[in-house]
């Protein structure tokens, strides 16, 4: 009996496999949907200079890509950019640069003008048509929630059938939409009436386009709430238009200015998928929409895509802004760039955004006024250790400084200093103190030391982060202002005096405050010194001053035995030296 021939599965990746990596995980240039990442010349040189395992973005899985599975089904995935060998890396980079430039040049027209001018004036006027009184009586002046559309249909039919008036149904609807829409119920009644007359009386797509445009404009002008009922009525009207004119997407066949108005309606209604469809259509046809509308769209993406996992959330959001690159090249609004900062997971992405702001934006400083704080916060999470994070933060500071004439506002300086403190980069903080001495109060300096204790520990040694630099910082900047700090501030930094020199000086400073009758943290300092074996470095004369204060003597009873022995040794050492 003949056997069924064995089917050998086709290797889908046989002719699709990336030439840049054997496992095919590195996406091809055309598969990447990142709207603003551009590798720097240094990053390109680094990738091309390694014989093996060259990479971009440190090889992290932060590159959004639309790839395909073995069946050819599209998959949205986070991918990394790694290359097995140096062979072909330059070809990949050239291909990506070509795709990037092509995307940036897609838009060559701007949607300008007033959409109201696209509407033909209605022939219906109150002065020459007495029947309009019936319409006024039907609609009334109140914000009626529900309205009988059948009664409206009869009035429309009566007006249209009067040959002396020479009116079309669109004249009636345009008049109603312009003068009698002050509630959701009235608008829904008009939509239902338009639907009922669609098959018999509306025979041109342009007429339907005009009615839909006036509907959207009236809703915006009267600031009507975009309710679920209103959205459903609108979609039913669109379905009726599609059915009448044998099309699947009449909104895409309208004038681009009309499509933009409809896009705004969908954004207001929270329909993200429909908004994405219209947005992509406009961009694909070379139209740049209003920038405030782009901002609203970005805000809609943020509000709708709320996955708990940050990588999944960011990936899905990238899918909705995949064609934003040409809009980014034209953007001037601070809120536009502020909405894009959370998309950055690697400093290479943030630096690409910085490059656009500094090279394309005319009001660069105004953009930084809005975005810089969020950029500082984002930078602190970019880098494999404190050394890289600190370097990225310094690069951000270096980039924005010229746009403030080398004089950053206080809120930005303090934000930079706080993050540098978390990375224990004391030389950078000292530089801020020298350049902006008036920005830092004694208590704020104490808060920087506290932040360094709460920051993530990192054993990586780098200039500015060594232990000795921290000691110098405390000696030169903290202790001279110690007496001006509040009790809470002094308490928060008591553990930082962990060397004999710093500890004894802090004890002396506290004694001066005690002598002045101020509240002190001497108990905390003594307890810390006891645990760190630093009490033996306190001079005998200082112990004598401490023992003259009754409340300090009472508080130091738990350490009395060791303190007495230490003070005795110190006194003996003093006498022998004399």
From Swiss-Prot:
<dbReference type="InterPro" id="IPR031467">
    <property type="entry name" value="Aep1"/>
</dbReference>
<keyword id="KW-0496">Mitochondrion</keyword>
<dbReference type="GO" id="GO:0045182">
    <property type="term" value="F:translation regulator activity"/>
</dbReference>
<dbReference type="GO" id="GO:0005739">
    <property type="term" value="C:mitochondrion"/>
</dbReference>
<keyword id="KW-0809">Transit peptide</keyword>
<keyword id="KW-0810">Translation regulation</keyword>
<comment type="function">
    <text>Required for translation of the mitochondrial OLI1 transcript coding for the mitochondrial ATP synthase subunit 9.</text>
</comment>
<protein>
    <recommendedName>
        <fullName>ATPase expression protein 1, mitochondrial</fullName>
    </recommendedName>
</protein>
<feature type="transit peptide" description="Mitochondrion">
    <location>
        <begin position="1"/>
        <end position="15"/>
    </location>
</feature>
<comment type="similarity">
    <text>Belongs to the AEP1 family.</text>
</comment>
<dbReference type="Pfam" id="PF17049">
    <property type="entry name" value="AEP1"/>
</dbReference>
């Amino acid at each position: 009996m003949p056997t069924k021939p064995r089917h050998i599965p086709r290797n889908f990746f046989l002719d699709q496999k990336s030439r840049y990596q054997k496992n095919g995980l590195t996406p091809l240039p055309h598969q990447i949907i990142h709207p603003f990442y551009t590798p720097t010349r240094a990053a390109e040189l680094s990738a091309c200079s390694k014989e093996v395992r060259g990479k971009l973005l440190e090889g992290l899985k932060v590159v959004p890509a639309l790839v395909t599975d073995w069946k050819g089904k599209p998959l949205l995935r986070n991918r990394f950019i790694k290359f097995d060998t140096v062979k072909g890396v330059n070809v990949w980079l050239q291909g990506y640069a070509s795709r990037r430039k092509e995307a940036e040049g897609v838009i060559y027209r701007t949607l300008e003008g007033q959409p109201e001018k696209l509407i033909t004036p209605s022939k219906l006027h109150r002065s020459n048509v007495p029947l309009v009184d019936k319409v006024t009586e039907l609609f009334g002046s109140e914000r009626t929630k529900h309205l009988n559309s059948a009664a409206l249909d009869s009035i429309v039919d009566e007006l249209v059938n009067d040959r002396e008036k020479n009116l079309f149904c669109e004249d009636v609807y345009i008049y109603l939409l312009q003068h009698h829409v002050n509630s959701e119920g009235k608008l829904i009644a008009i939509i239902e009436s338009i639907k009922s007359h669609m098959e018999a009386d509306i025979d041109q797509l342009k007429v339907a386009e005009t009615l839909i445009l006036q509907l959207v404009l009236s809703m915006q002008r009267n600031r009507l709430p975009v309710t679920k009922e209103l959205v459903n009525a609108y979609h039913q009207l669109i379905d009726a238009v599609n059915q009448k004119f044998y099309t699947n997407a009449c909104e895409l066949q309208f004038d681009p200015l009309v499509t933009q108005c409809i896009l705004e309606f969908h954004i207001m209604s929270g329909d993200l998928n429909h908004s994405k469809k219209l947005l992509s259509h406009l961009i694909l046809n070379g139209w740049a929409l209003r920038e405030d509308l782009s901002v609203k769209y970005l805000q809609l993406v943020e509000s709708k895509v709320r996955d708990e996992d940050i990588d999944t959330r960011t990936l899905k959001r990238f899918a909705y802004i995949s064609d934003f690159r040409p809009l980014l090249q034209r953007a001037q609004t601070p809120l536009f760039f502020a909405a894009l900062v959370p998309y950055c997971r690697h400093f290479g992405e943030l630096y690409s955004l910085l490059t656009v702001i500094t090279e394309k934006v005319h009001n660069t400083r105004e953009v930084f006024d809005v975005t810089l704080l969020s950029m500082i916060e984002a930078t602190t999470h970019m880098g494999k250790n404190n050394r890289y994070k600190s370097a990225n933060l310094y690069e951000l500071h270096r980039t924005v400084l010229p746009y403030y004439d080398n004089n950053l506002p206080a809120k930005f300086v303090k934000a930079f200093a706080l993050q540098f403190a978390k990375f224990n980069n004391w030389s950078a903080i000292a530089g801020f103190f020298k350049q902006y001495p008036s920005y830092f109060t004694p208590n704020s300096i104490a808060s920087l030391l506290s932040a360094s204790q709460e920051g993530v520990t990192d054993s990586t040694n780098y200039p500015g982060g060594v232990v000795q630099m921290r000691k110098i910082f405390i000696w030169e900047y903290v202790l001279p202002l110690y007496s001006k700090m509040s009790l809470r501030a002094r308490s928060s930094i008591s553990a930082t005096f962990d060397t004999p020199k710093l500890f004894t000086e802090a004890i002396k400073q506290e004694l001066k405050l005690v002598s002045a009758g101020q509240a002190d943290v001497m108990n905390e300092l003594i307890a810390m010194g006891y645990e760190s074996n630093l009490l033996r470095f306190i001079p005998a004369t200082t112990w004598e001053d401490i023992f003259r204060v009754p409340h300090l003597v009472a508080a130091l009873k738990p350490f009395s035995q060791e303190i007495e022995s230490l003070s005795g040794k110190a006194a003996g050492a003093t006498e022998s030296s004399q």
